[in-house]
Amino acid sequence: MGTAKKEQQRRIREGNTKDGNLRVKGENFYRDGKRVKFLNMYKGGKSIRNAKGDLIRAAPLQSTDVPTARVQPDRRWFGNTRVISQDALQHFRDALGDKKNDSYQVLLRRNKLPMSLLEEKDTSESPTAKIIDTEPYGATFGPKAQRKKPRVAAASLEDLAKATDSDSQKYEEKKELDSTLGLMAATEQEDGWSQVAKEAIFHKGQSKRIWNELYKVIDSSDVVIHVLDARDPLGTRCKSVEEYMKKETPHKHLIYVLNKCDLVPTWLAAAWVKHLSKDRPTLAFHASITNSFGKGSLIQLLRQFSQLHKDRQQISVGFIGYPNTGKSSIINTLRKKKVCQVAPIPGETKVWQYITLMKRIFLIDCPGIVPPSAKDTEEDILFRGVVRVEHVSHPEQYIPAVLRRCKRHHLERTYEISGWADATEFIEMLARKQGRLLKGGEPDETGVAKQVLNDFNRGKIPWFVSPPDRDPQPETSKRPADSEPETAQEAPEPPANKRLRV
């Protein structure tokens, strides 16, 4: 008896009919047994039929025989959504309510949570909130109904027509505002007063094109960086955009970057960081390709956001804010080269732009936006760098406001003049010192005023606004909460040894 037959008989006696260590036919040095079986599947994958064409042996994946199976009797198989008990839902709702308004707490895996059940809607102002209390169902429908006809707010058909026209007009206005995210609202405020007509130049940054660019940036960003001017952070803060994001996109992260901190004292930058950190994470920054400040802290913060969203292939970071606050300069600083066009004038960035920072982090540059407000005067808009000074008519009328906002010794040190009594004398002295005279020896007031305004906006003249919670005044002279904070002329300087902490 051959060796193969002896081995086969031994396996039969031991009850082991498996192949064991027998090699597959065709297995050699170049192909292992797994590869040979894989190739045999292609070769022998045809079905076998008899002379009549009936199927005798089906090819792989051709058989229609369904094996007997049993479905697990679990309620999750028979529901179209995930299920959760009311106790667990209430417990999670209480835990979420404690951390909901904390900007330093991040909710992960939001898509797997029933956010519509966790967020309780306020129905106190809804007209149908208390309809069951005023008109019970049993007294309205059924055999005990007492209402003869539906109650209508209008007393007559004419009143109903007027109400319909009013609602239609409000709907058209809302439809027009929706294209600008609802931010270009009417200029009339809650206190009932409105601002007088302004020049067309002071409405820059409020067009529909700008709002469309802002909408695209917010919609495409996972993290939104609000760039503020360190000299006047509250003036360059877009509160209406923040309210919109809080209401419509609560899952997006919003942080503040206090740019141009090199133009203010160190103690002031630290005070503003402490004040703004109560609302959002805030960083002090100085945009410069060669000598920057805060670059490492910002990159580290962006990497933390990237680690929080490991389930995504990449995250996008959008930069928004007032014109000429340094959004494009911050992007150039992070990339350490010029990838965005920058200029010391507002409106240089026209459309949004995608820039790659690293493999998983992308940056989005946005044009500057100016949320309309009736309380903003022409001086406020001009001093925030929203408009170009050369397009302003009669720029000398804004020089008195410059003298009020700046300290006298700063102006004397910048222009090397002294002894002026008012704005007119200041312009005349500066024009004669620089030799800017017209025919007849008259000073060029318009040209000198434009120069002073440009120096004011570009940081050549030191000025700043102190935080509102610094050095509170007595109760008798306390200003309202919505008033303008004190200027540099009123703010006392603390000791110079106070260092900035980011």
Curated annotation (Swiss-Prot):
Renumbered residue ranges of the record's region Disordered: 1-20, 459-502
Binding site for GTP: G321, Y322, P323, N324, T325, G326, K327, S328, D365, C366, P367, G368, I369
DNA-binding keyword on record: no
InterPro entries noted in UniProt: G_CP_dom, GNL2_CP_dom, GTP-bd, GTP-bd_ortho_bundle_sf, NOG2_N_dom, P-loop_NTPase, TRAFAC_YlqF/YawG_RiboMat
Gene Ontology biological-process annotations: ribosome biogenesis
CP-type G domain span: 211-372
Superkingdom field: Eukaryota
Record's keyword terms, sorted: GTP-binding, Nucleotide-binding, Nucleus, Ribosome biogenesis
GO MF annotation list: GTP binding
Broad class of where this protein is predominantly found: nucleus
Subcellular location: Nucleus, Nucleolus
Biased composition (Basic and acidic residues): 468-482
rRNA-binding recorded as keyword: no
Cellular component terms per the entry's GO annotation: nucleolus
Function: GTPase that associates with pre-60S ribosomal subunits in the nucleolus and is required for their nuclear export and maturation.
Entry similarity comment: Belongs to the TRAFAC class YlqF/YawG GTPase family. NOG2 subfamily.
Name of the protein in question: Nucleolar GTP-binding protein 2
